[in-house]
Curated annotation (Swiss-Prot):
Family membership: Belongs to the YABBY family.
PANTHER family: PROTEIN YABBY 2 (PTHR31675:SF38), PROTEIN YABBY 6-RELATED (PTHR31675)
Gene from which the chain derives: YAB2
SUPFAM superfamilies: HMG-box (SSF47095)
GO annotation (BP), single: cell fate commitment
UniProt-recorded name of the protein: Protein YABBY 2
Keywords associated with the record: Metal-binding, Nucleus, Zinc, Zinc-finger
Tissues in which the UniProt entry reports expression: Expressed in leaf blades, leaf sheaths and flowers.
GO terms, molecular function: zinc ion binding
UniProt organism field: Oryza sativa subsp. japonica
Compartmental location: Nucleus
Length: 186
């Protein structure tokens, strides 16, 4: 009996995402080992172009490494020249073997910008502080409910006017004569 050696239908490559600093395993079909492929990171969903041509000998032979890695959800596409992607030459593909992953620097992902709180959130925060200052025994839930009712019942608060300022402005608006429409020719 002769044993047939069947070539492995897929190889496992290790790709480093520069955006979220994740290393993930990509299962590459054997017929695509000499192509440029595009993979999508399952963590940050960014697309990475990877040139597999020079990496045929550098691929790890151990199949048990695949079991030890946490697999991220990703998609795999071959990148042919008829797609006309000019971005594939601008990115530097990064593939790592087991030894290379130990020498990587820890790069933190960019931090999200802090958003400015809305007028509603600022009002609720200040109103809860005011309510709790007047009645320290009130629960936070009750103070929030009261603050939300105050926001709903006092529409002048929405524009940043205090209760004393709003009554003065309302009195001025009611007592002032209404503007007359005048047509002018320019």
């Amino acid at each position: 009996m002769s044993a047939q050696i069947v070539p492995a239908p897929e190889h496992v490559c290790y790709v480093h995402c520069n955006f979220c600093n994740t290393i993930f395993a990509v299962s590459v079909p054997s017929n695509s080992m000499l192509n440029i492929v595009t993979v999508r990171c399952g963590h940050c969903t960014s697309l990475l172009s990877v040139n597999l041509r020079g990496l045929v000998q550098a691929l790890p032979a151990e199949d048990h490494l695949q079991d030890n890695l946490k697999m991220h959800n990703m998609s795999f596409r071959e990148n042919y020249s008829e797609y006309g992607s000019s971005s594939r030459y601008g990115r530097v593909p990064m593939m790592f073997s087991k030894n290379d992953t130990e020498h990587m620097l820890h790069v933190r992902p960019p931090e999200k910008r802090q958003r400015v709180p809305s007028a509603y959130n600022r009002f609720i925060k200040e109103e809860i502080r005011r309510i709790k200052a007047n009645n320290p025994d009130i629960s936070h839930r009750e103070a929030f409910s009261t603050a939300a009712k105050n926001w709903a019942h006092f529409p002048n608060i929405h524009f940043g006017l205090g209760s004393h300022e709003s009554s003065k402005k309302l009195d001025e608006a009611i007592g002032a004569p209404s503007p007359q429409k005048v047509q002018r020719l320019y």
